[in-house]
């Protein structure tokens, strides 16, 4: 368990806590909440806010931008404090240490009030001018989730194509790009588990739960300032996460489907081996010790797996109850 106790909601003076965030919240509930994880993005935040203001100007969409400072050490929080006087739509939350994009999105979600949420990084590789296009199909009631489809030249294109290709095959998804900006109904966030680094697979998890998904092309630009926080070392982690998500979606709700089948197969092998052993003993007049060991092993392991599947079913039921309780608590806190 991390020593981080949660998001720090502070005012300009150290030690004081604001009731909601570092910025005064608008009185009317917005239609759209833009969630912006930011780790050492002090140079990008002023331009991001300016472009966000321009993007929504004249759109008729009520909005807020929630920046989650994810343990920045470059003065990003100070910049946010300065920006709040210029942009009334800005709200800010601070993590005491880096917790990753998934946790930042979860924190932003807990403080968001819009019925549509948007994940948008602060590095300006995606321009805020595309946000109204992302949210339009959701606000009109056509779909539950919209993901961007990257356009233009960018680093790691080959790796991205392989990753997205594997994801489409594994999860049977109708979209071409999982690792881009996203907009979604807040019910999507209510329904899906967000574990570390699983934000990449929000589309897969949402689609598996029956939410409708579409994509729109969005230009990808060079980073405005700062440096990327992700390198090639993230590739093995991404592959393992992909397999973990697939396993969760396939067997998370019905663990007996996996462990029960494996247990039954091993038990069947044990029974067949036992019958073979009896036949050898009766008709050939001698025993075969390795076959006895195989019978015992198969029966024991098969029984353990089957019982493990039953225990897994009980755990799955408890997880569903906890998830529903958490959703209701989140609604009360909002």
What kind of region is each of these model predictions?
Residues 2-154, 193, 326-327, 332-334:
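Structured catalytic core of nucleotide-sugar glycosyltransferases
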Residues 54, 78, 187, 204, ...:
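Surface-exposed charge patches
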Residues 15-18, 22, 188-190, 212, ...:
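Intrinsically disordered, low-complexity Ser/Thr- and Pro-rich stretches
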Residues 41, 64, 215, 313, ...:
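Acidic-residue sensor for enzyme active/binding pockets
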Residues 253-334:
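Membrane-embedded multi-pass helical conduit in multi-pass membrane proteins
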Residues 100-105, 109-112, 125, 129, ...:
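Conserved catalytic loops of nucleotide-sugar-dependent glycosyltransferases that act on lipid-linked
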């Amino acid at each position: 368990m991390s020593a981080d106790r949660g998001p720090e909601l502070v005012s300009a003076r150290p030690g004081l806590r604001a009731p909601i965030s570092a910025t005064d919240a608008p009185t009317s509930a917005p239609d759209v909440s833009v969630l912006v994880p930011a780790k050492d993005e002090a140079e990008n935040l002023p331009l991001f806010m300016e472009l966000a203001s321009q993007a929504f100007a004249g759109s008729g969409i009520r909005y807020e931008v929630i920046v989650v400072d994810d343990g920045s050490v470059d003065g990003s929080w100070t910049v946010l404090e300065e920006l709040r006087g210029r942009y009334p739509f800005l709200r800010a939350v601070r993590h005491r240490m880096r917790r990753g994009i998934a946790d930042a999105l979860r924190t932003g979600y807990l403080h968001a009030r819009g019925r549509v949420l948007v994940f948008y990084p602060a590095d300006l590789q995606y321009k805020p001018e595309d946000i109204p296009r992302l949210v339009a199909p959701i606000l009109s009631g056509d779909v539950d989730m919209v993901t961007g489809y990257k356009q233009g030249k960018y680093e790691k294109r080959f790796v991205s194509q392989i990753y997205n290709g594997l994801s489409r095959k594994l999860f049977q998804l109708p979209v071409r790009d999982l690792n881009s900006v996203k907009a979604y109904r807040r019910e999507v966030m209510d329904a899906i588990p967000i574990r570390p680094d699983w934000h990449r697979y929000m589309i897969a998890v949402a689609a598996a739960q029956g939410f409708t998904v579409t994509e729109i092309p969005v230009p990808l630009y060079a980073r405005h300032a700062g440096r990327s926080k992700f390198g090639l070392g993230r590739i093995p982690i991404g592959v393992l996460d992909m397999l973990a998500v697939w396993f969760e979606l396939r067997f998370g709700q019905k663990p007996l489907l996996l462990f029960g089948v494996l247990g039954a197969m091993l038990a069947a092998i044990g029974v067949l081996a036992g019958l073979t052993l009896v036949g050898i003993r009766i008709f050939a007049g001698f025993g075969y010790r390795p076959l006895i060991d195989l019978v015992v092993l198969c029966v024991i392991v098969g029984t353990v797996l089957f019982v493990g599947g039953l225990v897994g079913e009980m755990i799955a039921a408890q997880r569903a109850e906890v998830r529903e309780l958490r959703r209701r608590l989140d609604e009360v806190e909002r």
